[in-house]
Every structure is written in C-alpha cells, then in structure tokens.
C-alpha cells in the first residue's frame, strides 16, 4: 500500500509504527457554526481512508478533535449573548447529527481543546524551558528561527516567509522577536474565557491544541495526520515545529491533505460567503447522495459542487442499488471473475486510496452482477465496497413481498391480455416510486 506524503511530495510505502495497527489524527471543526460541504469533504475523505484501512485488516485508532475555544467562537457567543461552552456544545451536537446522516463512523475519540488546557500549559512550559518559546507581555510565542526545516511541509522556506511578513505593523507583530513567530498562548482580553498559567491568564493558540491532543492520545509519533490542504500552512507546519521541538522525535510519518470543494472555480469557505451548510443541504438532498458525491472523487483532487454533480451521484446510486436489490445470494457464479474484481479494486485503492479508479472497477462489477451473477461471496464483496463508500441500502422485506405480489398480479393480467389491469398495476407501483423493467429474465423493479 502506498500513500502520497505531503511532506515528501511523493508516494511512499505505508509502514505503520506498530504492525497491524494505525494511529490516525484528523483535524476537526472549529465549532462556531454548522459544517459546510467543504468541511464535510475532509470528514468523508478520511472516513473512507479509515474504512479502507480496516477493510485491509488494520486496527485503526482514529482521533478527530473539536476546537471549542477560538476567536470565532468567542465572537459568535458574544453576538448571541451566550457562553462559549453553550455555543460550542450546540454545534458539536449538530456535527454529530450531520455526520451520522452521512454515515461517518464515529471517531475512537473526539477530544475537545478545553479538556486539555492543563496539558497545553505543561507543553508550553517545556518549550519555554528549552528556549523554543518566549513570553512577551503575557503572550507566549514560538521561536520559528530555532526550528529545523520549518515550513518544509508547505514547500516554503523561512526567508520567503520573513520577507512576506516584513511590512506588517499590527500590534501582535510588534510583540514578536520575528514576524514569523506564532502564538502558543494569548493573554486574556476583557470578558474573554481564560485559564490561569504561570505566565498569566489567557488561552491557548490554535496550533498548540492539536499538538497536545494528538500526542496525548496517540503518542509522540503518529502514523497518519490528515486535514484539508488549507491547513498545510500555517497550522500543520506549526504543529510539526512545536511538537518536534518538545519531543525531539518525528511528529508524523505520513501527512495527508484533501483537496478543496469549489464553487464557480473558488474554494468553498465561510470567509468568501459561498458556502452551503450540510445541515441546510440535507433538508433537500438525500444524505446518501451527498455522501456518494463527496466519497467517490480521489481525496487529493478538487471537487466541484454543482447540481449536475449531485444528480450524477443520485443516478449512480440508483444503478448500484438496483443491482444490489436483485443480487441472488444463492446463485452460482464464476468466482475467478470475482477474484479479479476484488484484486483490481484493492490494487486501485492501495495506490493512495484512489477511489476514482476503484469505482471504475466497481461499476464493472455492478454490470457483471446485473447479468445474473451472484452468490454469497459476491454479496459479501458488494457489502464490503458499500461499507467503504459509506452507502447503505435498506432492504424492506415486507414491502418487497408486497411489490412482488403486485408484479405477479400484473404478469397474470398480461398473460390473459388484460392490459388495462396490467397498466393499472404499473401505474399504482409508479405512484409508490417503483419502476418496472421487463427483461428476458422476467420483470425487475427499482425505486425512482
């Protein structure tokens, strides 16, 4: 199995630290609003990665955090005249509601930043003791100049970053030894939530939160760290700098970053105002359709959010569901063909989780099933791929029996040339969203 490592900019053989086990951390949402489709892309992309690793036999410890203390949360809470805790808890609940509908497997743990404040203070103190950090008027900053290979992850160099920051005159920059230094701790402002630290009251910076939560729960070195491409710099870059400064160990072995969701050629984001929340979209779009749309493009490629793309996803799901509903798990099939499908699917997915190539194989498999191939092993592979994709088809046996009875009655009407009765039954089924398809092997049905 190979993974494209953002740090090295190349495909690398995947070798977990502990054979058979994967320690995986994915940056979660800042909980001040509903997640939008771009946020959901990251959630679904790494859910698919996790599920495929489990399909391949790995035991995955999957951690994804909630940032529940942040400038945006404070601002939103003030505007509603509620506490930051009340606001963040509301949107954590909404996150679970949305992602459950998208059939995202719950993380092994979802730590909240506010649960690790004491550990963050200890982490910062170690950086101060090692002279990687300094205090400036109650704030604590990281000395970027002491970090080896700083910004290699983002393919940048420190000289360029310093040149780009040289014209800044904001208040925070004046507190720093260097414009590139970043905040580990922010001193308390009036009426803000804060915690007491040896250097004064305040709250942690954004970057320190993920370093502390990930290393506290997974250890000093992690197998896989994921997130959106926009997190390469500065967030993940700063995570590397501060984590490796503290531990002296490599922080992450494989960095993975998903591409953006674009709207009219621009990244979907709250700052641009071109976003659609998952909460509002799922009022009008079936969760399976959104899940399929997000899951079936290779995670590193950009994804264009359009009505046509959602319609295509819906049509593809219908084709897959139709094959699944009519798969006879008692039938006999050429198992060598099944082995070829399985091997080809694994070969595609083993190449950096290339679901696009995997879907090409899967669509060929679906066509093969539609030709009458079936059996228990065929159904088992079908179920495995659906699990990786995060798609579930509810087979309602009582309703299916009723439909089959109506189809049988229609067939009897056709045999006695009672076409009026036949058409009446067809129309009744269509009114229930059931479409009949006459084939040489008999009548099939599927949902509209």
Curated annotation (Swiss-Prot):
It is found in: Cytoplasm. It comes from the Bacteria. One of its GO terms (biological process) is cysteinyl-tRNA aminoacylation. GO terms for cellular component: cytosol. Gene3D superfamilies: Cysteine-tRNA ligase, C-terminal anti-codon recognition domain (1.20.120.1910), HUPs (3.40.50.620). SMART domains: DALR_2 (SM00840). One of its GO terms (molecular function) is cysteine-tRNA ligase activity. A motif ('KMSKS' region) lies at residues 267-271. It catalyses: tRNA(Cys) + L-cysteine + ATP = L-cysteinyl-tRNA(Cys) + AMP + diphosphate. Zn(2+) binds at residues 27, 210, 235, 239. ATP binds at residue 270. Monomer. Its cofactor is Zn(2+). Its main location: cytoplasm. NCBIfam families: cysS. This is Cysteine--tRNA ligase. InterPro entries: Cys-tRNA-ligase (IPR015803), Cys-tRNA-synt_Ia_DALR (IPR015273), Cys-tRNA/MSH_ligase (IPR024909), CysS_C (IPR056411), Rossmann-like_a/b/a_fold (IPR014729), tRNA-synt_1_cat_dom (IPR032678), tRNAsynth_Ia_anticodon-bd (IPR009080). Keywords: Aminoacyl-tRNA synthetase, ATP-binding, Cytoplasm, Ligase, Metal-binding, Nucleotide-binding, Protein biosynthesis, Zinc. PANTHER family: CYSTEINE--TRNA LIGASE, CYTOPLASMIC, CYSTEINYL-TRNA SYNTHETASE. Belongs to the class-I aminoacyl-tRNA synthetase family. The keyword Aminoacyl-tRNA synthetase applies. Its EC number is 6.1.1.16. Binds 1 zinc ion per subunit. It comes from Lactococcus lactis subsp. cremoris (strain SK11). A motif ('HIGH' region) lies at residues 29-39.
